[in-house]
């Protein structure tokens, strides 16, 4: 299945909307580090994201150590950012 890649203008609008997110150096993904009070809160966040990811069939790349969750969003079928990444980033923000 081919997924449309975001245009530069769409990508820039997304980053303006979500200022905590940054464009990865290669321009093909967005990244964010979430920090929580403790491991339980970080894990709870990851559980909420995981349920959403399964429902939408779009999964983040992430790394967790104690209260920190590092997230990378990209769409392999688009070879870069797509609306699916934008939707996932917005969902993650709503789970805070």
Swiss-Prot record:
InterPro entries cross-referenced by the UniProt entry: PCD_sf, Pterin_deHydtase
Superkingdom field: Bacteria
Recorded catalytic activity of this chain's protein: (4aS,6R)-4a-hydroxy-L-erythro-5,6,7,8-tetrahydrobiopterin = (6R)-L-erythro-6,7-dihydrobiopterin + H2O
EC class name: lyase
Keyword Lyase applies: yes
Keywords associated with the record: Lyase
SUPFAM superfamilies assigned to the protein according to its UniProt record, in alphabetical order: PCD-like (SSF55248)
Annotated S-S bridges: none
Catalytic activity, EC: 4.2.1.96
MF annotations from Gene Ontology: 4-alpha-hydroxytetrahydrobiopterin dehydratase activity
Keyword Ribonucleoprotein: no
BP GO annotations: tetrahydrobiopterin biosynthetic process
HAMAP family per record: Pterin_4_alpha (MF_00434)
Family per record: Belongs to the pterin-4-alpha-carbinolamine dehydratase family.
Protein name, per record: Putative pterin-4-alpha-carbinolamine dehydratase
